[in-house]
């Protein structure tokens, strides 16, 4: 049994998962410590509030409210579970976007801009084609594919700059992020898609339901009544599986990873490295565009376009998801669900206590920093393994070798030295 456990522990994947779990535990511990310190030092909070805050951080997804006595109650909260799945959808897709680029040795910090490009294209298509002429399901499909295409084209820009001009993709992505933000603002400003029917929604775009277009619930609303969940989470999971197969079961995936390991060695082996860079960033952009597309095709959320001075957090949270998942497509699913769970816990923390929901941002920040150091943890584990590895025994001398090596006692000194 011990030998089996030892063999499992020696696997690189096991140590990667262990490093991520350790990052999560330390992040939760730090968040709990912050809650405790604030609760014990604040004049408006108490130690009881601190204990309730810690409970909500760990069990916020299962919180059902407070009873008549004011105590927290826990159980299956269908609305919280469904909303967690809804919020996890863009996180999974932006996490995949970052992970695919990482596999090719690229840092896609431009997921936010690609997310905006996909959102813009999706909303224009979904709200411009009249559902009285074209079936709503077909409009949805065209809008979703259009969002992916817009994200792919926007992601291809830093890919082309990297492949053809060797411009650092981080710099190119940062620039394209803000170009996308201002371009989207201008396009919506001159459009007729602004919500003018509701005076309280100035600066917002109509929901896609205004044109009768929305993502199908696929029966999930019956499992999680009272929530915003829809079939987008299933689409995100399917795309994650497709990316996993692409990277691990195809020649193209091998070429992408070969370029990520060593671009010049891959070129020497006959792989078209420039094409891999452009296609990798295009795929990453398509996934980020799909994230924005599914989020707003849900019909649950209005897009705020006016004076866009902040990039969507989903693009940057995708970096945290990819780091936590160690860039594994299947791991991205679980990492996205975990990050979404923290988001729900933060909302419960705000609704049921006097704490601020941004405490969960502290937890996420700690987890991201530790996840970035997970490689050091793995290297440390590898070092310990090498130290514990027994040295191979010296080879036994061949029969008769000892006799051949012994000098002849009757020989002269010069002959003995020659024999030695």
Where are these regions (language model features)?
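Cytosolic-side transmembrane-helix boundaries in multi-pass membrane proteins
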Residues: 1-27, 32, 36-37, 51, ...
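Membrane-interfacial amphipathic/re-entrant helices at transmembrane-helix boundaries
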Residues: 2-93, 138
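Hydrophobic core segments of alpha-helical transmembrane domains in multi-pass membrane transport
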Residues: 19-36, 91-98, 119, 123-125, ...
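Single transmembrane alpha-helix segments in multi-pass membrane proteins
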Residues: 35-40, 59-129, 144-148, 152-167, ...
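Short, non-helical or kinked segments that cap or interrupt transmembrane helices
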Residues: 41-45, 49, 102-121, 163-172, ...
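Transmembrane helix-bundle core of multi-pass membrane transporters
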Residues: 177-249, 417
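Helix-loop-helix "hairpin" substructures at the membrane interface of multi-pass membrane proteins
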Residues: 224-302, 330
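Transmembrane alpha-helical segments in multi-pass inner-membrane proteins
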Residues: 282-365
């Amino acid at each position: 049994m011990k030998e089996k456990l030892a063999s499992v522990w020696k696997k690189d994947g096991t140590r990667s998962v262990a490093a991520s779990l350790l990052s999560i535990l330390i992040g939760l511990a730090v968040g709990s410590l912050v809650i405790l310190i604030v609760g014990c030092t604040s004049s408006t909070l108490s130690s009881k509030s601190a204990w309730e805050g810690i409970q909500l951080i760990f069990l916020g997804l299962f919180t059902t409210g407070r009873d008549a006595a004011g105590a927290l109650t826990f159980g299956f909260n269908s609305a919280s579970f469904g909303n967690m799945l809804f919020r996890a959808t863009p996180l999974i897709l932006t996490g995949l976007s970052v992970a695919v680029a990482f596999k090719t040795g690229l840092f896609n910090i431009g997921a936010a801009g690609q997310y905006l490009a996909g959102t813009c294209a999706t909303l224009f298509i979904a709200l411009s084609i009249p559902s009285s002429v074209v079936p709503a399901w077909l409009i949805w499909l065209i809008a979703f594919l259009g969002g992916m295409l817009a994200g792919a084209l926007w992601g291809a820009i830093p890919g082309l700059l990297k492949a053809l001009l060797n411009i650092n993709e981080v710099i190119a992505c940062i620039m394209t992020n803000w170009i996308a933000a201002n371009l989207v603002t201008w396009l919506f400003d001159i459009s007729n898609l602004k919500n003018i029917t509701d005076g309280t929604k100035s600066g917002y775009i109509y929901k896609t339901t205004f044109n009768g277009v929305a993502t199908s619930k696929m029966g999930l609303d019956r499992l999680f009544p009272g929530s915003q969940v829809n079939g987008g989470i299933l689409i995100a999971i399917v795309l994650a599986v497709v990316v996993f197969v692409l990277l691990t079961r195809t020649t193209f995936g091998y070429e992408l990873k070969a370029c990520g390991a060593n671009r010049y060695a891959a070129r020497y082996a006959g792989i078209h490295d420039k094409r891999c860079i452009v296609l990798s960033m295009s795929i990453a952009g398509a996934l980020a565009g799909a994230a924005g597309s599914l989020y707003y095709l849900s019909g649950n959320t209005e897009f705020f376009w006016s004076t866009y001075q902040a990039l969507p957090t989903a693009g940057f949270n995708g970096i945290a998801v990819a780091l936590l998942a160690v860039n594994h497509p299947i791991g991205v699913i679980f990492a996205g669900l975990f990050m979404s769970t923290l988001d729900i816990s933060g909302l419960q923390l705000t609704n049921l206590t006097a704490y601020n929901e941004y405490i969960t941002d502290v937890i996420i920040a700690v987890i991201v920093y530790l996840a970035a150091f997970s490689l050091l943890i793995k290297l440390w584990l590898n070092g310990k393994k090498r130290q514990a590895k027994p040295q191979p025994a010296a080879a036994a001398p061949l029969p008769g070798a000892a006799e051949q090596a012994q000098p002849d006692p009757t020989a002269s000194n010069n002959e003995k030295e020659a024999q030695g």
